[in-house]
Amino acid sequence: PYSAVVFDEFVEVKMDGPNGDETVHCKLLCGADGAHSWVRRNFRMGNPRETMIGFQIEVTGYNGDSGMLDMYTGKNIAPGFFSWAIPTGDTTRVGTWTKSELMNGLSSEQYLDELLQDQKINSRFEQCSEVARFCGPVPSGVVRKPLIERVALFGDSAGVCKPTTGGGIGPGFKQVDLLVPRLSKCMENNELSRGTMKSISALLKEMARNQRKKRALRDAFL
């Protein structure tokens, strides 16, 4: 989309479609459009408290204990956070994550290289062959306005990722379970006013509180 405007009875969304410009009207606009959410930015709904950066490769040949998750810490491989090796059947996912302000000008790939070349543990990585790689931001900390009149944010766009592991699927489903029953009832009556949405967004206060507690514990131990 390149435009979205809230009216009393609907949201008007304009977008580039396969046949040119298209205009769509909807009762509720759901922004489930990721860490760089256009919906969140367009409506100035706030930013996640922090955005971590994760880099992960999938490898064969990792010399770890069968069925066991390995975690590695250290400022040279994941400053302020940790790295991991997670078995997934025939392959292992090896990754590292941190925050941009802790990276001292290095890239996520460089930190992962440090992990793979660490003299204390590199015997586990000697036979590894990379088969895939993934990199991206991990937004954590529920945004200031997850719901406004006729607009709701979900998942990464709302900043629901766990501050301890970066996981977003579980919290995303939990957010859906919390909000959708109320939103569905309100949509039946087309009652999605600012006051109503503010009331529904209060359901996320406990999630935000848990994020703050877990972030404090993470920062205390890593």
Regions found by a protein language model. Name each.
Residues 181-222:
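C-terminal helical "tail/cap" subdomain of flavin- and related membrane-associated enzymes
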Residues 73-90, 136-155, 204-219:
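A broadly tuned preference for mixed-charge, low-complexity surface segments
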Residues 68-77, 94-101, 127-141, 174-177, ...:
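Noncatalytic linker/hinge segments flanking ATPase motor cores
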Residues 1-123, 139-143, 159:
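Predominantly flavin-linked oxidoreductase catalytic cores and closely associated redox partners
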Residues 41-42, 164, 214:
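Short, function-defining helix-loop hinge/capping sites that tune catalysis or transport
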Residues 3, 103-183, 187-188:
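FAD/FMN-dependent oxidoreductases across multiple families
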